[in-house]
Amino acid sequence: MTYKADLHVHTAASLDGLSSLEELTAAAKEAGLDAVAITDHNLCTPVPQRLNGVLLIPGCEVSTRQGHVTGLFLEEPLDLEGLRKNGLPQGGDAVEEIHRRGGIAVLAHPYQSPGAASEDFDFRPDCVEGANARAALKVKEANERAAALAQSLGL
C-alpha cells in the first residue's frame, strides 16, 4: 500500500506552528495526504491514531548541538528533561533516546542555516530529511545538499 505523507508537521504547540491538530488534519485531507507526523519542537504530544480520516504518526523534533533530530513512530514520549539536563543534548544522545522509545531518527533540514556543518555530526541517523520547504526558502541549495548527504550515508 502506498501512502502520501508529510513527516514533519508542527501544531500551534510549536513556536513555528500555527494550526490546531484538527485544522492540520483537515488541511492534510484536503491536500490529498493520507498521513502526517506531528513533530512539535521539544514536545512529545500524544496524538490519536486518526483524525479527519488522516493517519497520525507520533513524533517529536529535538533541538541538539548538531541541529534538529526528529523522532518518528515513537511508542512512548522521549525523556526530554533527561536529554537536556546539561543544556542542548548531543545529536547522538537524541538518536539513542529515539531508538529506546521505538522510533526512527531523522536528521531534519540539515542545511537550513547558512554555513551549517552537518558533516560534523557524531551520530548516524536512520534518515535525512531531503525536502523541506522552509529550508529551501532560507538556503537555496539546502534540499539538494541534504539529499546528497543522505546518499553519501547510504540512506
Which residues make up each language-model segment?
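A metal-dependent hydrolase metal-coordination microenvironment
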Residues: M1-I104, G115-A117, F123, E129-G154
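Short, well-ordered beta-to-alpha junction loops that form the rim of enzyme active sites
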Residues: H109-Y111
